[in-house]
């Protein structure tokens, strides 16, 4: 890694010295395009010859910022064009400065009224940013046909979705933002895909972003620029040989009139889903030999999986508004969990069949109040937000357990009655001040309070018709109170137009109290403070060649349910329990990269302290095992990647090749040490457009074998084929998708801990066929609705 950094610095210094010999002419022009409300514009910028108006250089800008290098002209004419504003010209003459910053250019609105603008061009899927982030277009691509945001993220390059966790390759688990504000997993699941414009994958987040998580995925919704009514209705049917069939009905709409805006959405999922886990546990030592073959089959039935929301906003002016939003989701889960465990020891042959009739109901609700004010004159803005989140869950599972021990049959019945409530209050304020045309200061503060209460009662009977008796060993109560205060400062500027920098620091103070009756009465109380510095450098060598380097520090706190020792019962020898002794995971990440033409190169190193992992550990009984989260000692990770995108009139393609190397270290749980080897990641997303007929999507990715020192993860892959056609002047779209065609997506691997060899293989409902019909309706004309979600770090830990 040291050699790579030295090489990076050497190349940069060489190129800077090479460009420094040019003088006596304009070399570099930069600036930012905004309207009179200080909002960044998008369009095209051209450098023209003053003598004959011939084109010298040209490129598009999407976020208002533009820059040209290696101009070598004494005078040029700058032309700005866009459908958003009137054509604008600037005449620039060399006056002794070869690097010219035009500052902020305010453009006038385009008074030409266009009834319809039809753009017939292949939409590029990916945009690489100079700071190492990537921007993925969703609107008007076949990615917008995804049933859920979770499914959508599984199609994004370098993003891995598995077992409810969303990770960025080379970084780790990511936190999810909506329009720049952190949201919970439940709120994330309720976002209609039809409202998403694009997705940002931010691998090097600044101090403005919460310190939780190792990367940030920012979901950006469409800006509704039209008044009246506008919406979409979608019906989806999914059929899987493995998991069964399901339906998903989605409706979202918005209504705008004058200064009032109203939005709403509703989604309902019905049907079935399946997940199968096969696990073997072997103790080869003859003195305590044991082999367990366990299969757990989750056959889920969605009685009522629905999400809903509505929001109201009053706009004082284009950048000043107040908004109120209510959203929620219901998860009424039925079905059965079938567990079969065969245990062989030197003394006994044991078999247990356990069937859990699921009756779980969750109701999650969120209220969000926001106020935003911006002053275009001095370049300042202030956001104040308040959010209340409430999570309620009730479990009434009936467990039928049959045992066969040395040819002796046994049967018993268990009732698992549990309920938990979580209440979270968040307040935050963010202030941004423009210091100069090249400098910006961001400061903010946040306070949150979380209260979690769980009660679990296990009742046992030998006969389903007789009275059940309370079981102290499996039952428990859990209470957790937490307060987190945070403040941040981030300053961004540029030096001599040679490079841009952003430096920031975030401080967070945490105080919590935990009490549980599991394994006897236990109480924990602690407070701690952390400081998270970060630095980002962007170095434009030319229009086509840009370098970046970054350092960020992060933290990953345990999820609330990961701390709760509440028992999820599978059989007498297998339970899933939380660990109240889990510690936060600290992360230090370094990255260097280059953007050349359409190629994106990255090299990175991440060091983790107390990384949070999981394992099956031996329980109190000789043959019992508990699946729980644990802290390892440290982890070292290296990664390298190269990406390339291109687009023609009929073909758009994004391709990525990455390599990741990790080594996990443990000095506590007696993991067996093994080899380490890198993991290969391949990704290709291709859209083919047959004009006037249909679009075809071919997506494939491959994640190779991985050995990280304490275990091995086996390879997995997926291939997706989709076809879409539009009818009724694009108002109706039909899409057919075949997902995971070759059934390559599963999660399997092995590790050894506490003299026990463990192998696991998990299969999901990813091999399916899906038919989607989407109809767009409305009579909209012109307005602007801005919605913002309050930052809620603590909500991201509610899973």
Enumerate the predicted regions with their spans:
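Transmembrane beta-barrel wall of Gram-negative outer-membrane proteins
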Residues: 243-276, 288-337, 362-367, 373, ...
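N-terminal periplasmic accessory domains that precede
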Residues: 103-106, 149-152, 186, 212-235, ...
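Face-selective signature of the C-terminal outer-membrane beta-barrel domain
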Residues: 307-331, 358-515, 540-544, 599-601, ...
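Outer membrane beta-barrel strand-and-loop segments of large Gram-negative receptors
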Residues: 424-426, 471-476, 583, 589, ...
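Short, acidic, small-residue-rich periplasmic hinge/interaction motif at the N-terminus
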Residues: 46-48, 81-85, 99-142, 162-163, ...
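Short acidic/polar hinge/loop motifs at secondary-structure boundaries
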Residues: 155, 181-207
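Surface-exposed extracellular loop regions of Gram-negative outer-membrane beta-barrel proteins
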Residues: 221-237, 276, 280-283, 294, ...
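Outer-membrane beta-barrel signature, preferentially recognizing the C-terminal barrel domain
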Residues: 476-482, 555-609, 625-638, 764-767
């Amino acid at each position: 890694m040291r050699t790579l950094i030295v090489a990076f610095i050497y190349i940069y210094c060489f190129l800077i010295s090479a460009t420094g010999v040019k003088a006596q002419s304009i070399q570099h022009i930069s600036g930012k395009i905004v309207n009179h409300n200080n909002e960044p514009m998008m369009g095209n910028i051209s450098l023209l010859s003053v003598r004959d108006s011939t084109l010298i250089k040209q490129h598009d800008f999407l976020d208002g910022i533009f820059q040209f290098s290696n101009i070598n002209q004494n005078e040029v004419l700058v032309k700005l064009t866009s459908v958003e504003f009137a054509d604008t010209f600037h005449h620039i003459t060399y006056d002794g400065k070869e690097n010219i910053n035009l500052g902020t250019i305010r453009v006038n609105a385009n008074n030409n009224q266009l009834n319809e603008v039809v753009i017939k061009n292949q939409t590029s899927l990916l945009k690489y940013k100079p700071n190492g982030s990537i921007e993925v277009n969703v609107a008007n691509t076949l990615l917008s046909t995804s049933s859920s945001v979770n499914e959508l993220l599984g199609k994004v390059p370098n993003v891995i979705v598995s077992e409810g966790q969303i990770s960025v390759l080379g970084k780790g688990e990511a936190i999810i933002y909506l329009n720049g504000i952190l949201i919970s997993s439940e709120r994330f699941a309720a976002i209609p895909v039809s409202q998403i414009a694009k997705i940002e994958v931010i691998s090097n987040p600044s101090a403005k972003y919460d310190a939780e998580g190792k990367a940030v995925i920012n979901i950006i919704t469409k800006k509704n620029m039209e008044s009246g009514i506008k919406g979409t209705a979608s019906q989806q049917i999914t059929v899987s040989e493995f998991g069964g069939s399901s339906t998903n009905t989605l409706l979202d709409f918005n209504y705008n009139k004058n200064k009032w805006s109203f939005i709403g959405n509703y989604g309902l999922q019905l049907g079935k889903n399946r997940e199968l886990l096969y696990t073997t546990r072997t103790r080869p030592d003859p003195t305590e030999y044991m082999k367990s073959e366990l299969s757990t089959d989750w056959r889920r039935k969605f009685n009522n999986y629905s999400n809903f929301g509505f929001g109201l906003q009053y706009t004082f002016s284009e950048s000043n508004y107040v908004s109120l939003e209510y959203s929620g989701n219901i998860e009424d889960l039925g079905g059965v969990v079938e567990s079969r465990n065969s245990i062989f020891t030197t003394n006994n042959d044991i078999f247990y069949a356990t069937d859990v009739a699921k009756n779980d109901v969750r109701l999650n609700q969120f209220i969000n109040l926001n106020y935003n004010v911006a002053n275009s004159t001095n370049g300042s803005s202030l956001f104040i937000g308040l959010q209340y989140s409430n999570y309620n869950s009730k479990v009434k599972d009936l467990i039928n357990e049959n045992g066969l021990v040395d040819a002796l049959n046994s049967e018993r019945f268990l009732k698992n009655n549990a309920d938990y409530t979580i209440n979270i209050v968040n307040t935050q304020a963010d202030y941004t001040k423009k210091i100069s045309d090249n400098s910006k200061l961001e400061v903010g503060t946040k306070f949150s309070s979380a209260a979690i209460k769980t009660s679990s009662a296990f009742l046992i009977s030998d006969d389903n018709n007789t009275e059940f008796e309370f079981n102290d060993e499996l039952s428990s109560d859990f209470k957790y109170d937490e307060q987190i205060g945070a403040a941040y400062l981030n300053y961004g500027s540029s030096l001599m137009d040679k490079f841009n920098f952003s430096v920031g620091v975030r401080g967070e103070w945490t105080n919590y109290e935990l009490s549980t009756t599991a394994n006897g009465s236990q109480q924990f109380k602690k407070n701690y403070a952390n400081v998270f510095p970060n630095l980002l450098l962007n170095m434009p060598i030319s229009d086509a060649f840009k370098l970046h380097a970054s350092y960020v520090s992060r933290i990953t706190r345990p999820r609330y349910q990961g701390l709760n020792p509440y028992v999820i019962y599978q059989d007498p020898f297998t339970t899933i329990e939380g660990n109240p002794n889990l510690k936060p995971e600290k992360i230090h990440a370094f990255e260097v990269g280059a953007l050349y033409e359409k190629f994106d190169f990255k090299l990175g190193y991440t060091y983790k302290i107390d990384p949070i992992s999981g394992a099956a550990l031996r329980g109190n009984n000789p043959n019992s095992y508990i699946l729980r989260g644990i802290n390892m000692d440290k982890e070292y990770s290296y990664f390298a990647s190269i990406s390339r995108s291109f687009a023609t009139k009929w073909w758009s393609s994004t391709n990525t090749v990455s390599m990741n190397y990790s080594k996990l270290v443990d000095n506590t749980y007696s993991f067996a040490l093994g080899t380490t080897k890198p993991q290969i990641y391949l990704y290709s997303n291709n859209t083919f457009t047959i004009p006037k007929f249909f679009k075809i999507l071919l997506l494939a990715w491959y994640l190779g074998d991985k050995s990280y020192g304490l275990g091995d993860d086996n390879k997995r892959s997926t291939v997706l084929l989709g076809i879409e056609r539009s009818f009724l002047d694009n108002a109706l779209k039909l899409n057919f998708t075949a997902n995971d065609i070759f059934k390559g997506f599963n999660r399997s691997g092995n590790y050894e801990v506490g003299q026990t060899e463990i192998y696991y293989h998990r299969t999901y409902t990813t091999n399916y066929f899906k038919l989607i019909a989407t109809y767009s309706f409305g009579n909209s004309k012109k307005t602007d609705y801005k919605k913002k979600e309050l930052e809620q770090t603590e909500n991201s830990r509610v899973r």
